Curated annotation (Swiss-Prot):
Cross-referenced HAMAP family: Pole_loc_TmaR (MF_00683)
Entries under Pfam families matching the protein: DUF496
Protein name, entry field: Pole-localizer protein TmaR
Predominant location: cytoplasm
Function comment: Pole-localizer protein involved in the regulation of several cellular processes.
UniProt family annotation: Belongs to the pole-localizer TmaR family.
Keyword Coiled coil among record annotations: yes
Compartments (UniProt record): Cytoplasm
GO CC terms: cytosol
Species assigned in the record: Buchnera aphidicola subsp. Schizaphis graminum (strain Sg)
Assigned keywords, A-Z: Coiled coil, Cytoplasm
Domain of life the protein comes from: Bacteria
Gene name tied to this protein: tmaR
InterPro entries (alphabetical): DUF496
Amino acid sequence: MNTKKTFKSALEFVHKFRRKNKIKREISDIEKKIRDNQKRILLLDNLNQYITPDMNYEEIKKIIFMMKNDYEDRIDDYIVKNAELSKEKRSLSKELKLIVD
């Protein structure tokens, strides 16, 4: 009987632990969606500040093009930074493995 209770407790623990991890992932996903939408709002606000009633179509397109280039440059910078951090993480993992072994 005690083994049955222990097994049931273990299953309940695993179930709750998995649920907790799923909730953490969902919260992280929702936070990312909130950040993305806040960035979109900021982008539209910025665009609204640059566009004036006297501008023609070509001037507006130029502003959008420049903003797009700026964001693409930022993405490139983030990709490089991410690669550098990944390399450092791999190096630390190797060093930690050597310490443990």
